Amino acid sequence: ISYRAGDQPNNAVSLNVFNPGEIASTAGTSGVVYGVLGDVNYDPKSRVNTFAHANYTTDLDRLGVLLCINGTGILNAWVHRNVTPDVSYADMNDLAASVPIGSEGVKIIPFGNGAERVLQNQEVGCSIRGINFNKHNRAHIVRAAQEGIVFSFCYGMEIMQQMGMDIKKIHAGKATMFLSPLFRDTLAGVSGATIELYETDGSACAAKGAVIGAGIYK
């Protein structure tokens, strides 16, 4: 065996995430924010998980901090299935972009896919709030869903910052919800981090890691 890694450290390596303050993120059915910490630390409430990153050594502290949000792409898919079944995901993004920032008061809490670690394993469910029958339409719901997911990400990222992580850059694959300009712009604006998209996946990283581990490449 020349290389081994869990799915998220492996994904982070495929996205060139090695240094403190760098973040690897995915936004599929569930969403992940995986950041690199340069000092040994942990969250006392275990809302995020800490373990050795792929480039950790006894002389170099590189720890991966993992946040998982269960209600990410599954919320977007639920909205598509139940609110906008007649349009594509790309058209959903256009609908969302037609609504002002903040969805004119509509708020969606995206925790509807089971217990959330970031909430200390509470199962609070998803909720939609602030709908005015005289003002709001489905475009507001589409946008509020994406905004709610972003703020759930940022809630977890604040925990990482409390652990000493200076979040500067988010790396993500060019796929799933990161295909939405609105999602990307909102996440960048709220988190204050830049976002870089990569045409890659974890399988490519595993192959490269195995070759490096075998000593074929240095």
Please tell me what each predicted stretch does.
Residues 1-171, 176-218:
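Active-site core segments that coordinate phosphate-bearing ligands/cofactors
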